[in-house]
Each structure stands twice: as structure tokens, then as C-alpha cells.
Amino acid sequence: MKQIDLKDQYFGTEIEMTGISRYDAAVAIGRMFGTEPYHIRSYDSWCVKDSDGKTWKFSRDSSIDCERLANGTVIDADGDYSTEMVSPKLEYSEMGKLQEVVRCVKNAGAFVNSSCGMHVHVDASNHTPRSLKNALTIMYCKEDILFKALNVQTRREDEYCQKVRPMVLEKIRRMPNSTITMEKFKRAWYEGNDGSSEHYNWTRYYALNLHAVFSKGTLEWRCFESTLHAGKVRSNITLALAISCLLYTSPSPRDTER
């Protein structure tokens, strides 16, 4: 397989937060970039363009427990405070810009709570059925360690960030590298049906979401707790990029016990 440098991969992220309304978050970022926010109906989002013309969205997410500060006390808030920041497609050289956006919304009043998660997308355009097979096998072998290191909540693991399905992994691992195709891989991932056209297909709720490969063209890691610490945001993204890069060069690992 071809070798890819970590910094040659495109990425994006979704960071869930509360403490700030979607409108106020867009206003703060627009002020930073010198642009005006605008509203779109999709997910009741407020959007703003950066100096490169890329769109940053602040969308509603029903999984977020909405809160805000009142006289220094955290209180319940209405749905306006359900705020998910959706970055545009970024190059590694734009990591600093992302970190400035994170700092900006934090300084404007945003914070995270236990209901908030962070997702990282990595461009899948160079991935192959063999590299995706590597992805599932590596995740299966290392998930317990990864979840412990990232302090993944049991609730998140049970609902939105499940571990690899052993039966699906075994079926894919039995496919010879010489004959495996993306179509065969896709059928195995969806357990016989093609769910790639369904936005909320049930297979998206895994720590490594390969539904995103077939629906969006990205590998998605959903195993991160949300953070507005710019350094931790960078670390989470770099980890996902490093794993993605490893998939191109690793021989298919053995399916060992966790």
C-alpha cells in the first residue's frame, strides 16, 4: 500500500458544547474573522466564513444537555444552547486556525459537560478495503486501552461510541486481500444491506465509524470526550491522523484477544 504522511491528510472535527448559543458562537467567530454570521435551516445552524472562505457551522444536537452560567452558577438552559461546532475540511497547516476558533468560543462563554463529545473525521479518499480491514482489526485489538486512556464514559460506549462488532470483523478478516473489494467490505459492514444512503444508519454509532466512509468519504473517530482546551483538541486530531496513517503501512495484524 502507498505511504501517506500524517500531515498530508485532510481532517475535520465536530465539537459539542453548551454555555453559549449557536448565534453567539457564530458572532464571536465572525468577529474574529471579520465576517458576518448567517442562518440556515439545516439543524437550525448559524454559519460564518473564515478568511479563506471556508464555512464554520454551529448546529443543534439533541444529545447535548443544555446549560448556561447565571451569576456564576451553572443552570439549565433552552435549546438555543445546544451547540455543536462543525469545522470545514481542513489541512494540517490550518490546525492553528482551528485552535484559535476553539479559544475564541471558550472565551465567549462556551463550556462542555458530560453529555458533550468530540468527533474527528479523516479523509478516506486514499483508503482501500485492505487499509479499512487494518482499521477494524487494530481498533478491535486496542479499543480497551484506547477507551481507558481517553476516559470514555460507559454511557457513551453503550450508546454513541460502541466497540467493534466481532462477527463483522471476522467476516471481513476472512476476505483475502487479493480479492477484497470496497463493495464486499461495505456489504459486510452493513451486515448484508447497503445503508450508505441513510444519514442516521445504525452502524454510525461506533468508536470507529466506517459508515462515514461510505456516506461522507471520511473515517470518523467518535471516542473522544469533548474539550475546549485547544491543545487537547489538537492531540485528539493528531491521534486520529496517526492511526489513519498507520493503516496504510501496517500488515494486517492478527486478531488477538483484547
Can you annotate each of these PLM segments?
Residues 111-127, 218-222:
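Histidine-centered divalent-metal-coordination microenvironment in nucleic-acid enzymes
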Residues 248-258:
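Single conserved hydrophobic/aromatic residue that forms the stacking wall/gate
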Residues 1-108:
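Terminal catalytic/cofactor-binding subdomain
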Residues 31, 94-101, 125-150, 228-244:
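Helical (often loop-to-helix) elements that flank the catalytic cores of nucleotide-handling enzymes
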